[in-house]
Amino acid sequence: MKTEEPLSATVEEYLEMIYNMNMEDEVVIGARLAEKFLVAPPTVTEMLKRLVRDGYVEMDNRRQVTLTETGNQAAEAVLRRHRLTERFLVDMLGMQWHQVHEEACRLEHFISGAVEARVITTLNNPTTCPHGNPIPGSVANARSYLKDKGAIRLSSVGIGEVVSILCISEVVEDEEALILYLHEKGLTPGTQLTVLGEDGGSGGGNEQDESFKVQVDGREVCISKASSAKIWVTR
């Protein structure tokens, strides 16, 4: 019997990124993917041609990219391994919340089905990764998780509103400076905060834009508008 060839790490990373951008209602086009992966546009163009050829993605007349059912299943399989690995690194190995994304990116491509099953059993079938994102297969309809939870971006919350952090965008988990800043300031899933108002400076990440202050556990924290758009909250 012919064994299906495993996907390359690069293909899996593209499928993950497209899935996450689709989930967060971001427009997925070649130029945006080039920005995310820090590669030249022609590199992305060639990869998208391959993904279309192999039946993983479709492109409309505006060159917007969406996953096919095959692509969606493949993306969820690798995201499941990624988020389970993050959970294992935090819960079992004691690594810090902000340290595990890169490690999981390296390990996710090599985890067998047997190891995945053992991790699930050991961790009692967790439903989210340490950053609050859903684990496909452990959460029904993971792709619509944000909509089902009624989540909104922190940047859209009005002054004086009290909200709870649901998750941090998977799309920006590789922005180490931002993830470390959120960790240090206690802006993690489950944290309740109050939006206080505009602030003249910039906080979190390297964005030089306007920012606003939030109150967390009685402390005032400054976060940039760009960074706050990467935090999903619920009222």
Regions found by a protein language model. Give the residues of each.
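Key DNA-contact positions within bacterial/archaeal DNA-binding proteins
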Residues: 42, 98
